[in-house]
């Protein structure tokens, strides 16, 4: 028996989905058709059926009393509640967001659900029963449905139901449903928007007519991209943002440069004419790049605010700019002028990434970069993504380019709110932009705008798109531009008349003609066809003393071996660290990891910040670094490099996600924007670095030559043949050497801890100078603790990095030396170890060994001076552990031929050509390695072929 209590009505606090749930539970309670929560059962016993009594004001202003349990409307209320949620979640399926398609045809599940309820049913239900925050003027459920359909199924469509944070989801729905986003624009802003669209369209059409057939990758069809970027930049500036970073591909790039980044039309036209124009700022390197790859930096302002906007240089490798720009932003956000971790302020900058609709789901670098968005080492406080969606990728339709309904669907997996907007509705586009920037600034998370338009011409302007998309291009040919559509709307609304609209058009045309008239004729002088490397680059890195006083090194080492009282270091790690205690004393030896830590500390003390990332960089892949300690009881972390005295620069070391491409791009971008920082990326094994090959090819090796974009990024690539198979042996040095030219980077493979110490300090010393360049290091694995790679304290406190080293105790009788062996890295240590072992007898008087520590630029003068000492030299041999078609041989061969001259033979000893870098059998590997070593040291071997074992040949 229900004990009806009339003094209190607990149901009054239930609304919408919550009320629907309680009503559904009461139905189960009454019918006994299912289990009901005990607490609800008690409420039902005390208070009876859930009720909501209200006066329902209908369209004719008459009021009726409504009570669900009295009218038997429980099922209808549930359907309305479900319908409201379906509109919120699936309204996008009915929205008119594609200007090339008609509105949805009403066959969706959502439309069917709407048809199950009559207007009379909906009028009988009070609005607040199903929508607690129903705005003023919304009285019935019918009003609710009409209002929500207006919000969710027009030219703006929203996907928020996948957002896991309920606070964020509620905020998004409230922003949309309160209609604050769609407040009418002032006539002044509407006129300004039309002027902007007229400028964008006029610029593109002027290029089309003036430079017939030249590629420009027109923005036409998604013209609203420019005002959308304007709005985001302006609103960001109002929020105090100092830097806005933009990454985008070539589609629409020229218009963005001209309008958002204010590149003068005359400078754009000069690039098309191949003319020199006064005042043009060179933003390219000595080889340059095509105009639609170039970036720009510009302070953008209006009468109220200003901010710096950077459009990143970009190759045609779509989407690879994404992590680069994220690195820009993180660098701009961090204060690196104090010891410890950098201090990050995400309100100082943010990123806008403009994607293609085919590239966003198609390129894996997109998901790699999205995965960085909430990681401590990489998050930038939210990126605004804009898909410039023209529904076709070159000639490929969307049904052939993605497996999802929308090109934006990938973003759902990363909890990113999505707004689809019709690019032919300018004011809706601005509303989307406004929501995006507000969300980013409030929640510090990513947001995506799917700007759906079309492509008026082919992939480029010489391409005929009707060949592959004949039907849609019939539509596009007759479809008015967004400028024309908006001009008609403003004229119909009485904002502007026809004459005023024509005046705006004529003003744009006159401006374009005037700027074009400023451009001189094409420059056809010989100077324009000669590419000259700047002298400061051509002369390379000059010798730099990088030693550190011994007392300073000892003080640093003491600090490195200290940790807070009560901090429990893992016993095995503690033992490793304690072995380093006497390393800098008279008879001590310094291993690789300690040399690195000493270098880091000394660099920090000189005011240079350091950032190191990689998949296992805190500990080190080979358990050697231990630069971050973990308390065994609390898992609290501690890095001694954060507590050393006399440091006024930050140090950060992060374990990265299992990604190479995105992380390399990010670190490159960070370094470009923070040129004073020693930024290092470490591969888990060098073999895996090739998944970032596009970044090495397009950015790290060529960025300065193409764009004048300097970088001092350090790549640490573990390399060495130790019988671990083809996936854990080779960093493929041949690829980095193939890319080496014009002093674009340094490639090194070192043989001692001291050399590593000095090259790191040398690299730090050139940061922020014209001499700066990336450093590619083939780092050791088994050599990390090898006795022959250990160094003394004096070797760190004195001298500098040596590009070539001579093997000690060889070449002491110059007139007897017949064979000069050149090698690098682990191969050189294997040769030294064989000599030291004394296991075999060799005529060592007739041999000399030189370790090439710096492969590129090759230390020709040093090696030539060594060769001149040996008057009876007969042969110069390059010895390597990699197969002949890999490693350094093909890079070294022409160098050796030139060094040897006509009278001295040159030769190769190593494995023969192979398709795989290494074999999988450790015993076969060991046998091959022993043959290489013995043949290299046996002067009597005298060049023969043995394809089954190793390959030896001469010229």
Swiss-Prot record:
Gene3D superfamilies documented for this protein: 3.40.50.12470, 3.40.50.970, Multifunctional 2-oxoglutarate metabolism enzyme, C-terminal domain
Keywords from the UniProt entry: Glycolysis, Oxidoreductase, Thiamine pyrophosphate
InterPro entries: 2oxoglutarate_DH_E1, 2oxoglutarate_DH_E1_bac, DH_E1, KGD_C_sf, ODO-1/KGD_C, THDP-binding, Transketolase-like_Pyr-bd
Entry's Gene Ontology cellular component terms: cytosol; oxoglutarate dehydrogenase complex
Signal peptide span: none
Function field: E1 component of the 2-oxoglutarate dehydrogenase (OGDH) complex which catalyzes the decarboxylation of 2-oxoglutarate, the first step in the conversion of 2-oxoglutarate to succinyl-CoA and CO(2).
Assembly information from the UniProt record: Homodimer. Part of the 2-oxoglutarate dehydrogenase (OGDH) complex composed of E1 (2-oxoglutarate dehydrogenase), E2 (dihydrolipoamide succinyltransferase) and E3 (dihydrolipoamide dehydrogenase); the complex contains multiple copies of the three enzymatic components (E1, E2 and E3).
Family label: Belongs to the alpha-ketoglutarate dehydrogenase family.
Protein name per UniProt: 2-oxoglutarate dehydrogenase E1 component
